């Protein structure tokens, strides 16, 4: 029987050079001398065809892919543990204490794995019920793939994935990772599984626990500048952790997460890990608004004399108490403060107290300061003329660096073997065009300073030293703004603010875009300055300013005559 099928095939064996072929039960050709299996076409007649005398069906059966000795099945949580380890080492190299890496972050990670039942538990997350569900959705999948699809949450009606992309049961695991399955369920509920943004959220929680002087905006900026590994970090995985299929979506980074998103993820992680109350934020901690506002006064080139009024706002709003500042995940409604955004919001409220920022009073006070022979008097107009061009130049530089950022991977991800050649061809064409256009546009592009210079917490440098952005105004006084003979000590006797009505719970949205056209231009510019310094949206700073004003006015209206007027008038909202 074998001779009839192999009679027309006389090619020698590639292993032993013999011409003695047989056909296995699966239709594969094999050498009877050395038992070498080849990918030979077996031709059979198709009797159902109209031209069955000449019709033939070609059947090719490829041998199963052999697993290399260096490869092994690995868990997705192993990949995230590898990422957290590298991020922690980068933070320690930047000056963070060793306790952050060896004790706090490791304990957080262990609590996370235990509470999500991925490790350190006798009842792991892979349940028999979930495996049965996957088999019912894809009967053609092998038993091995069904057992691999176990990275799920123990919920009653959801199907989870680490990648955050919903897929059906038929597209189960096609990679070396055990846990590459959908993270969102049929009802779209977010699971407790780890993601790339959540690695940053966990690092931030650990930094907050050890009370390191690194705010969330500092962390995100270090990530964007490449000082903390985040982009293309999967390329440093060990050789045995080969990525393919759904693993691509898990570790793929297409953009940097926003401030608000990381803060939200930090709250979720704190709830998952069931963390106790964090260490107290006292005045000796740099997360406290008193020392933190000094930093941002230096950053914005504002006078140190303004800090006296900043402290009055902090005290008047009750924002210096330990209970208000300390993060406690055990509360019924835990609230994680935006310490950095809150600090600049306090500065803006203090500036409104002194200069009003209504496009009239601040310029009048600046003209009065210009008449003084003493150059140590702070003029807001001069401050604006110094800071504005520096801000525009820094913004342009940031846009250029963002345009140069390489989001593509050194080695393209292959999600489907059938598309491998197409993906590789597209990458070759893209790289070729990029090189050609780069030579045409800029023969010698400047290397980004963010990857060559050491990290600094300040965006601007003010002073008389070489390389500074402009003259410093930190030591100037506020003689034209603070009047000793005035009713409340301020040249500005009125305080304006937008509507302070609080939105209903769970329906709160930013109203900045709605009110921005009617707001004074100087106030909007100050919002823009501090939003650039922090790397957040103007709306984030605006909403935090409203929060500070609500607390400050609620506690001081008609109670503190030194900071409020005795009459309430209406002009652009309530006037104090």
From Swiss-Prot:
Region N-terminal cyclin fold, annotated ranges: 74-246
One Gene Ontology MF term: zinc ion binding
Region: B-linker, residue numbers: 71-73
Superkingdom, natural source: Eukaryota
Keyword Cell membrane in annotation: no
Disordered, as annotated region: 137-157
Keywords, sorted A to Z: DNA-binding, Metal-binding, Nucleus, Transcription, Transcription regulation, Zinc, Zinc-finger
Gene Ontology CC terms: RNA polymerase I core factor complex; RNA polymerase transcription factor SL1 complex
Family matches, as Pfam families: Rrn7_cyclin_C, Rrn7_cyclin_N, Zn_ribbon_RRN7
Main localization category: nucleus
Zn-finger (RRN7-type) residues: 6-39
Family: Belongs to the RRN7/TAF1B family.
Cited function: Component of RNA polymerase I core factor complex that acts as a GTF2B/TFIIB-like factor and plays a key role in multiple steps during transcription initiation such as pre-initiation complex (PIC) assembly and postpolymerase recruitment events in polymerase I (Pol I) transcription. Binds rDNA promoters and plays a role in Pol I recruitment.
Protein name: TATA box-binding protein-associated factor RNA polymerase I subunit B
């Amino acid at each position: 029987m074998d001779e009839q099928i192999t009679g027309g095939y006389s090619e020698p064996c590639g292993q032993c050079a013999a011409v003695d072929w047989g056909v296995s039960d699966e239709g594969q050709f094999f050498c009877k001398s050395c038992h070498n299996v080849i990918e030979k076409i077996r031709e059979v007649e198709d009797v159902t065809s109209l031209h069955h005398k000449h019709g033939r069906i070609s059947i090719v059966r490829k041998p199963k892919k052999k697993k290399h000795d260096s490869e092994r099945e690995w868990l997705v949580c192993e990949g995230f543990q590898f990422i957290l380890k590298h991020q922690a080492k980068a933070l320690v190299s930047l000056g963070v204490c060793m306790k952050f890496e060896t004790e706090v972050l490791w304990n957080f990670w262990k609590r996370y794995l235990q509470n999500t039942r991925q490790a350190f538990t006798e009842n792991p997350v892979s349940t028999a019920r979930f495996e049965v569900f996957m088999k019912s959705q894809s009967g053609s999948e092998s038993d091995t793939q069904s057992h691999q699809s176990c990275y799920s949450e123990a919920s009653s009606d959801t199907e989870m994935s680490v990648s955050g992309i919903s897929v059906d049961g038929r597209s189960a695991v096609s990679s070396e990772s055990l846990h590459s399955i959908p993270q969102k369920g049929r009802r779209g509920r977010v699971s407790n599984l780890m993601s790339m943004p959540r690695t940053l959220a966990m690092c931030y929680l650990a930094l907050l626990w050890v009370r390191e002087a690194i705010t969330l905006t500092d962390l995100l900026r270090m990530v964007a500048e490449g000082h903390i590994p985040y982009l293309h970090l999967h390329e440093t995985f060990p050789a045995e952790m080969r990525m393919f299929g759904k693993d691509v979506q898990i570790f793929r980074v297409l953009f940097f997460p926003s401030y608000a998103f990381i803060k939200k993820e930090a709250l979720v992680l704190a709830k998952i890990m069931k963390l106790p109350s964090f260490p107290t934020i006292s005045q000796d901690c740099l997360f406290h608004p008193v020392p933190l506002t000094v930093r941002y006064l230096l950053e914005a080139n504002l006078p140190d004399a303004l800090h006296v009024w900043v402290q009055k706002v902090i005290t008047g709003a009750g924002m210096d108490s330990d209970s208000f500042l300390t993060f406690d995940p055990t509360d019924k409604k835990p609230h994680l403060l935006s310490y950095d955004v809150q600090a600049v919001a306090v500065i803006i409220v203090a500036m409104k107290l002194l200069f009003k920022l209504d496009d009239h009073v601040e310029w009048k006070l600046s003209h009065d300061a210009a008449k003084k022979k003493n150059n140590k008097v702070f003029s807001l107009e001069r401050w604006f003329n110094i800071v504005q061009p520096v801000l525009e130049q820094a913004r342009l530089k940031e846009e250029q660096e963002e345009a140069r950022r390489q989001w593509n991977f050194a080695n393209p991800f292959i999600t489907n073997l059938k598309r491998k050649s197409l993906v590789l061809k597209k990458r070759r064409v893209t790289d070729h065009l990029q090189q050609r256009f780069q030579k045409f546009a800029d023969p010698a592009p400047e290397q980004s300073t963010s990857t060559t210079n050491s990290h600094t917490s300040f965006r601007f440098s003010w002073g008389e030293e070489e390389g500074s952005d402009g003259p410093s105004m930190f030591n100037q006084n506020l003689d034209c703004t603070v009047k000793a003979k005035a009713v409340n000590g301020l040249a500005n006797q009125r305080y304006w603010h937008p509507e302070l009505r609080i939105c209903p719970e769970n329906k709160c949205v930013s109203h900045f875009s709605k009110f921005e056209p009617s707001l004074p231009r100087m106030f909007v510019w100050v919002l823009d300055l501090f939003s650039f310094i922090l790397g957040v949206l103007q709306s984030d700073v605006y909403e935090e300013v409203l929060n500070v004003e609500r607390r400050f006015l609620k506690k001081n209206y008609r109670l503190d005559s030194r900071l409020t007027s005795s009459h309430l008038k209406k002009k652009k909202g309530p006037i104090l």
